[in-house]
Amino acid sequence: APFAAEWDREHTFPAQALKELGELGALGMCVPEEWGGAGMDYMSLVLTLEEIAAGDGATSTIVSVQNSLPCGIINKYGTDAQKEEWLKPLARGEKLGCFCLTEPHTGSDASAITTRADRDGDSFVLNGVKHYITTGKYAQMAIVFAVTDKTAGKKGISCFLVPTETPG
């Protein structure tokens, strides 16, 4: 990555590099081809991340997050409609996703999160604060964890796919 030091120094987001990595299939490596991914295994992902990290640790982190969190979660748990809307463009690198778990007073302890999701008709209203969100400023969708049933403990935590242009 000939520009890595400059990007770090100037706090530049590697948008063009990510676009090119997406075109190469590196942003959806373990996603099946039918959903826009490369259909590879996790060893291939690890080796790719290692090579990218040799040139730029920040870019490798973004590639890791995109593959493992938004793509991985939607691939495993998403409906076909969610995969069509989100997984395909995420895997092709046309969109970026971010992962919203960490909170100011609970850290990354998922069982202690306080962000709530309250039902409002057919929708949910999310209330809470998240931080340390890799690619959050540049993402088009967020994977957000929130408590939907406080009495159920860990089983009362749900995961939401939220377009980042959603007001609030």
Walk through the language-model features, giving the residues of each.
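Hydrophobic, small-residue-rich alpha-helical packing segments that form membrane-like cores
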Residues: 108-109, 124
